[in-house]
Amino acid sequence: MLVEEKIINQTIQLFQAKGLKFTLDELASELRISKKTIYQYFPSKEAILNEVVEYGFRRIQAKKTAILTSELTTIEKLKRVLIAIPNQYEQIDFSSLKGLEKIYPQVAKNLQAHFESDWEPIFALVEQGIDEEVFRPVNLVVLKMTLTAAFNYFLSTNDLESSGLTYREALQELVEVVMHGLVINE
């Protein structure tokens, strides 16, 4: 495994344990390397976090591609694409991202940009479902706005934690709510 990849993976683990409060000293200690070595790959903690976001969305994209090219039904594909998150991100308490925009504004912008992009495969699935008469016609812009707002809300409040839900459980519940508004017959 490359040093850069080890830094990313350890950052994910530290974030899982401490949220945004982990330090580069802790990261270096966990990796058994010097901070200077980390700085050879990343100029700052914010740069590392940006790469963690990029890495996560690359993994999400790979999962989505596998789902979209599978033999699943259109309904099942849409359900799975909407909740696609990398395995190593499943245990993360995403409420730890609350306040991200104040501390690491560039990372927050990057995360938001990813939430707002690459909706074409989802739109195509919904349109396919409409053509197959398993989904009722819906305004795709409103669907995107609803889902994006929910994703952002999940990440920006402590409501999931206080209700005992993980991010993945909340996504699954959101998908159930959305799908029962779309599905004609299952």
Ranges and model annotations:
Residues 6, 10, 14-47, 51:
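Helix-turn-helix
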Residues 51, 65-91, 144-147:
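Hydrophobic alpha-helical connector segments
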Residues 75-76, 113-116, 130-148, 165-169, ...:
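All-alpha amphipathic helical-bundle segments outside canonical DNA-binding/catalytic cores
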Residues 86-124, 131-134:
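Short secondary-structure transition hinges
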